C-alpha cells in the first residue's frame, strides 16, 4: 500500500502539511513517531505498516479476494474441514501494540475480511491504542454511513481505505458479488470526507483494465474528490489463483506509470515525494494473521514466525535476513518475479491452513535465491 506518512515533511504539499499539523495538535506522540520514520530509514532501520487480520468474517465474496483462502467458508467448501487453530484475542493485540511501539513502529491497518462487521472492532482500536499508533481501517464501505464514519473518527481511527473496483455500477457489483455495493461505496466516500477522516480509494487492476475509459473515469473521480487512488495489481494468490487471466502484463504496468504523472494514482512500487523503496516486503509492510502468524506481504502466504512464540523484533529480523525479502529490489516479488512465484506456488499449493509456517516455507536454511526452486 501507499502511505504518504512515511515521507519527510519537506516533501509534503500544503494540504498534507495541514493534515500533519492537525495530527500533531491532537496526537503529538503519534505525529512525532511518523516524523521519525524518515530518519529511521536513513539509519537503515525499517518501519513497516502492520496489517492486522484479527478476523476474516466478510459480508462479500469478491472475485479477486486475496484473503479468501484464509476464510472458514473456503476451508469448509473446498477442503471440508474447519480451522481449529486458536485465534488471537485482545490481550494479543495489546502486546503487539506495545512491541511495535517499543520498535518505533507507528502504523496499523485493521483489515480482514471486512473489519466493520467485527463485533469487537471498537475494542481492537482501543487495544492498538490510537494515542500511540496511527490507526487505519480497510472497508468495502457497505456499513460506512455518516453515523459510522463519525464514530470511527471519535474512537481514534485516522484513515479509511475504501475498495472501489469499477466506475460502472453493474461491473463493480458483479466483481464484488454484492448488488448495491457500488452505491454504498460512493456513500461511504462522502461520509468519510464529511467526518474528517483521511481517505484513500483502493482498486484492483486486472489485465487490460488500465486501457479502458472506465479506469480513466475512476482516476478523474478520485482527483475531483481530492483523494488518492491506490492500485493493487491482481496477483496469482487467493481467489485470483483461479483466474490467471486477471494478472496484468508489462504493457499494463507501463501505461499505469504514465497515468501516475497525470493523476494522484499510485501502487506500492510508486516513488513517493522523491523516495523510491522498491518492493516493500518486510521493509514497508507485514501482515499479522488471525492465528498470530506474520507474513511479509498481503499476497505472500508463507510465515516468518508466530508472535505467540517469537517476538516481533526477531520476526522482522528473519525477514530482513531472507534474500528474497530483505534486499532492495525494483520489481514486485510476488507479482513479477517468476522464480519466486514458482517457489511460492510449490510451497502453498493445496496447503489447507495458510500461511505456510516458518520452517516449511521460509526459513533460515533457504538462504539463497534458488533454494527450494526446481530447475
Where in the sequence are the language-model features?
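Radical SAM enzyme [4Fe-4S]-AdoMet core and its adjacent flexible, acidic
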Residues: 1-9, 155, 159, 163-165, ...
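Conserved alpha-helical substructure of the radical SAM core
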Residues: 2-158
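Flexible mid-to-C-terminal extensions adjoining Fe-S/redox cofactors in radical SAM and related proteins
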Residues: 2-13, 18-36, 41, 46, ...
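Short loop/turn microsegments at loop-to-beta-strand junctions
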Residues: 50, 282-284
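Processing junctions and N-termini across compartments
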Residues: 52, 56-59, 273, 291, ...
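Short cysteine clusters
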Residues: 58, 62-65, 279, 297, ...
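Generic structural signal for helix capping and beta-alpha/helix-loop junctions
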Residues: 72, 117, 145, 169, ...
Amino acid at each position: 500500500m501507499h502511505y504518504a506518512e512515511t515521507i519527510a515533511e519537506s516533501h509534503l504539499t500544503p494540504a498534507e502539511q495541514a493534515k500533519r499539523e492537525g495530527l500533531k495538535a491532537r496526537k503529538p506522540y503519534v505525529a512525532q513517531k511518523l516524523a521519525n520514520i524518515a530518519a529511521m530509514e536513513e539509519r537503515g532501520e525499517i518501519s513497516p505498516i502492520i496489517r492486522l487480520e484479527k478476523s476474516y468474517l466478510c459480508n462479500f465474496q469478491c472475485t479477486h479476494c486475496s484473503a479468501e483462502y484464509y476464510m472458514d467458508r473456503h476451508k469448509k467448501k473446498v477442503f471440508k474441514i474447519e480451522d481449529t487453530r486458536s485465534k488471537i484475542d485482545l490481550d494479543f493485540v495489546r502486546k503487539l501494540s506495545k512491541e511495535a511501539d517499543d520498535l518505533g513502529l507507528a502504523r496499523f491497518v485493521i483489515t480482514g475480511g471486512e473489519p466493520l462487521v467485527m463485533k469487537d472492532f471498537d475494542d481492537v482500536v482501543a487495544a492498538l491504542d490510537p494515542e500511540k499508533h496511527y490507526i487505519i481501517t480497510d472497508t468495502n464501505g457497505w456499513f460506512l454511513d455518516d453515523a459510522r464514519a463519525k464514530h470511527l473518527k471519535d474512537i481514534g481511527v485516522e484513515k479509511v481505505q475504501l475498495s472501489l473496483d469499477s466506475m460502472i455500477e453493474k461491473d463493480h457489483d458483479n466483481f464484488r458479488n454484492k448488488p448495491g455495493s457500488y452505491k454504498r461505496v460512493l456513500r461511504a466516500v462522502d461520509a468519510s470526507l464529511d467526518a474528517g477522516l483521511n481517505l484513500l480509494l483502493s482498486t484492483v487492476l486486472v489485465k487490460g483494465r488500465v486501457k479502458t475509459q472506465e479506469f480513466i473515469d475512476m482516476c478523474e473521480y478520485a482527483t475531483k474528490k481530492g483523494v488518492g487512488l491506490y492500485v493493487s495489481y491482481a496477483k496469482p494468490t487467493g481467489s485470483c489463483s483461479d483466474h490467471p487471466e486477471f494478472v496484468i502484463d508489462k504493457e499494463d504496468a507501463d501505461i499505469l506509470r504514465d497515468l501516475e504523472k497525470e493523476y494522484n494514482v499510485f501502487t506500492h512500487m510508486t516513488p513517493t515525494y522523491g523516495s523510491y523503496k522498491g518492493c516493500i516486503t518486510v521493509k514497508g509492510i507485514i501482515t499479522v494473521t488471525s492465528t498470530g502468524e506474520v507474513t511479509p506481504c498481503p499476497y505472500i502466504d508463507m510465515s516468518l514466525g508466530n508472535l505467540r512464540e517469537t517476538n516481533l523484533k526477531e520476526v522482522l529480523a528473519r525477514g530482513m535476513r531472507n534474500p528474497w525479502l530483505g534486499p532492495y529490489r525494483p520489481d514486485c516479488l510476488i507479482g513479477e518475479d517468476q522464480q519466486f512465484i514458482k517457489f511460492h506456488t510449490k510451497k502453498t499449493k493445496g496447503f489447507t491452513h495458510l500461511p505456510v509456517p516458518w520452517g516449511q516455507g521460509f526459513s533460515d536454511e533457504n538462504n539463497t535465491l534458488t533454494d527450494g526452486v526446481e530447475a
